[in-house]
Amino acid sequence: MKLFHRHLVARGICPSESGPNPPSQPALVTAFCDWFRTHRGVKEPTLRQYARGATDLLRTLGEDVDQWKAQAVRDFLLKRASQCGTPTTQALITSLRAFLRFLNFRGEFRGDLALAIPAVAHWRLSRLPRCLSADEVNRLVAACDGTDLRRLRDRAIILTLVRLGLRSGDVAGLRLTDINWNSGTLQVIGKGRYQVRLPLPQDVGDALLRYLECRPANIDTDHVFVRSNAPCRPFASGDGVSSVVKHALKRANIDAPAKGAHLLRHTAATEMLRNGVPLDQAGLVLRHRSINMTAYYAKADVTLLKQIAQPWPEVNA
């Protein structure tokens, strides 16, 4: 009923739900998001993350930003950091630095308060990548077998993620015009509006074709992937794609180290390197800005690492 009501609201057939209006976003945060969207090409999921941190800072320290002090900004971050883990703290630091630099650019205060944001202890590339084995990938794909729209869609999503290493937002944003059947390629527009055309593997193309043959033709969107329940709208963000992966992992009874779509991106990257794809070529497919990011996945090939490991010298007492 909720989906049907939203559909009627979107069509203007019935009024929206009554109730208290959500708190409005501060004008400075709106201007901040607009600037980053226009000048930096930042996508909506990242902007929402930035906006949460900026809004929290404004409501804590007050909107009279020219009165802010470095110590107050630092105390705000340290308090929030004590309530969450390292990844969340790192995301908050990125948001706050971007917002404070924007305010400085606008001349809202003198000095650069972004310098007051401390760094969080983090050793780059210190963790092993989280990925699935080849057998687990096969089980995951098999868990999407079926002829109904949802299973065909899930299979196409899983294969697109695990074969091409796309991000969840990339998959959610795919349009029908991004698929070039004649050349067998897929155009992807990723972070910073960076465009790349990737070769379409046979199994991915077959899965997409089977899904599109069953996809409702009368829906008002050119997005490739849509929700299976009427009115079959596109995914609002990559979270919907990650939800598809999460449910498929559960059906396959796979106890994965992570549950979202990024697990399959890690798996694709690791598999490329295991099969001898050079780092620079794997980085092009994954659209990494630095080869160091791609090298992170080389650590997952334990068999290869054993071949180059040096014997530990014996020490005579």
Segments from the language model and where they lie:
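Conserved catalytic core of the tyrosine transesterase superfamily
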Residues: 1-317
